[in-house]
C-alpha cells in the first residue's frame, strides 16, 4: 500500500490485505487508458468526480441497463447486470481521478461511504425490487474493495476486509430509457486529497490548463 494508506487513521484490524488491482485483473474489469479516459472538462455540464480536502470523493451517477424494471426474475437480472456495469464504469473513473497526476490509485481507497441507486420502475409501490436491482452495483463494489457479499466472500466474510461495503439508498419509481442510475461516495486519505487538489485541482475530468499540465508529466 502507499504511504497515504499506511498513515491513514483506520484500525490495523480493518486494513485491506490485498492489492485491489489483483482483483480487478481477476474480474476482468477494464480500466481504459490515459489517452481515452483522462480528458478535458471543457463544455461539460457536470463533473464526473469531485474531491474534497477532507478525503471524500463524490462520483456522479451514470446509467445502466436498457429496460424498466418489473417483478420478473429475468428483468431484475437485467437490471442487476446493468448495475454491475455502472460499478465497473465508476471504478474506472475513480482509478483515473486518483491516478492521472501520479499521486495515488485505487489502493488508496480507505472505505466506501454511501451509494444511491435510482431504479426505473412503476411507482406507487407497484415494484418492490429496487434493493435487489441495486445489489448488482453494491456487490461488485464488495468484490473489488472487500465486502461480505462479493465474489471473494466465504460464509459471509471477505478475508480482505470491508472497504467495499457502504451505506445505501435504493429507490424505485423513476422514469427513463434505462434500468438504473447509481452514484457513490468514497473516502481516501485526506493527505492524498490535498496533494491532488494542490497539484491539479478538485475536479475530474480536468480543467484544460490542468489537463495540459498532467499530459506534460505523463509523457
Language-model features: where?
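Short glycine-rich or small-residue beta-strand-to-loop segments that form or flank ligand, phosphate
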Residues: 114-121
